[in-house]
């Protein structure tokens, strides 16, 4: 694995407040890394330090193996796209995309070729002569991306780039981002608070909370095995049950089934239905169950089996296969 950038014990304090707390992080070259976590966890602060917009209180940031902790942003060779696209309104789409190339004094003929190629890459070749304000949000987003990519950055940094788009477009642009990253082989670091976005896009996802890294790895490894309750909650796990030996287990609502008999392996709990919410293809069945230790735990089962007819007040059994019961460290 070639390393594009590295955080070594990087801390950022604002007065008494520690926004980023001694993180170590490796950004692999040619891959897409997401920094994922709730608001305030230090994602943007980390990205800004990587970009050079803020200097760590302590620790080092290496880019291509070179200590770049104090290198100014314009000398880091990075492309960046923010939540607000920050396009130049008085320039055409092509001029926006060519802006960084002009600054770098690329000859006009070559610049024209690179701009055309980059606009084709993001599917906007036909809008080269338009002004940004004539474009939809999704199109403006692509222009901002094209402008950042045109300079062939060592690292492409994206801060919540899709969060201003409506839900449908956002999902479409995820696929587009993946395609563009695969076609260009760029190293991308993306900040998001959206777990679905991180799961779908990442080669490596880094789950953060309160300035620390809780877990990192490929989505296929992190998702089925969250390191602790905080990561599990952030990834949409519910139904936390403590067993007699003190271990904490969790099951996703879609893996809890209504059954007529206890299953031998896995988890089975009995309880009373509190609520049934109809949601079209599925129903959310809320149950107050006995955890086997005399305590009541509230469980939610996402039931897709139309034959199940649970009603509030019914006593039912909820069960999950062993394969879907995740044991947490803490
Ligand atoms: P969000 O998604 O809301 O941007 P985030 O995970 O990106 O969240 P950061 O923007 O990195 O979080 O902020 C982390 C914490 O540091 C927050 O509590 C924020 O208020 C604080 N913070 C960030 N920048 C500064 C600053 N310049 N001065 C003081 N506090 C700051």
Please give the residue ranges for each predicted region.
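Helix-to-loop junction immediately C-terminal to a conserved catalytic motif
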Residues: 51
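Non-catalytic connector elements of ABC transporters
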Residues: 247-330
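ABC ATPase nucleotide-binding domain
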Residues: 6, 26, 62, 317-319
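ABC ATPase nucleotide-binding domains
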Residues: 32, 73-79, 83-227
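The feature captures the beta-strand-to-loop junction immediately N-terminal to the Walker
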Residues: 36-38
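ABC ATPase nucleotide-binding domain helices that frame the ATP-binding cleft
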Residues: 44-47, 143
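Conserved ABC transporter NBD signature motif
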Residues: 59-67
């Amino acid at each position: 694995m070639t390393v594009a950038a590295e955080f070594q014990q990087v801390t950022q304090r604002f007065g008494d407040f520690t926004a980023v707390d001694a993180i170590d992080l490796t950004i692999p070259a040619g891959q897409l890394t997401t920094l994922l976590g709730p608001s305030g966890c230090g994602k943007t602060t980390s990205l800004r330090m990587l970009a050079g917009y803020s200097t760590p209180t302590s620790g080092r940031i290496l880019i291509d193996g070179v200590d770049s902790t104090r290198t100014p942003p314009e000398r880091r060779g990075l492309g960046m796209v923010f939540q607000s696209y920050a396009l130049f309104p008085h320039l055409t789409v092509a001029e926006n995309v060519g802006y960084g190339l002009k600054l770098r004094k690329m000859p006009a003929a070559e610049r024209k070729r690179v701009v055309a190629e980059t606009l084709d890459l993001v599917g906007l070749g036909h809008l080269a002569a338009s002004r940004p304000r004539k474009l939809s949000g999704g199109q403006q987003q692509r222009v901002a991306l094209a402008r950042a990519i045109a300079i062939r950055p060592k690292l492409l940094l994206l801060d919540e780039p899709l969060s201003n788009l409506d839900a449908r477009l956002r999902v479409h642009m995820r696929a587009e981002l993946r395609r563009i990253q695969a076609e260009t082989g760029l190293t991308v670091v993306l900040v998001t608070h959206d777990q679905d976005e991180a799961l779908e896009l990442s080669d490596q996802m880094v789950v953060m909370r309160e300035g620390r890294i809780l877990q990192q790895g490929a989505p296929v490894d992190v998702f089925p095995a969250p390191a602790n309750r905080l990561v599990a909650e952030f990834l949409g796990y519910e139904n936390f049950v403590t067993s007699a030996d003190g271990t904490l287990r969790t099951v996703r609502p879609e893996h809890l089934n209504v059954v007529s008999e206890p299953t031998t392996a896995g988890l089975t709990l009995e309880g009373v239905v509190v609520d049934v919410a109809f949601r079209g293809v599925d129903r959310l069945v809320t149950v107050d169950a006995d955890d086997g230790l005399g305590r009541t735990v509230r469980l939610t089962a996402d039931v897709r089996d139309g034959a199940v007819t649970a009603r509030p007040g019914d006593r039912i059994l909820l069960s999950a296969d062993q394969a879907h019961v995740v044991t947490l460290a803490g």
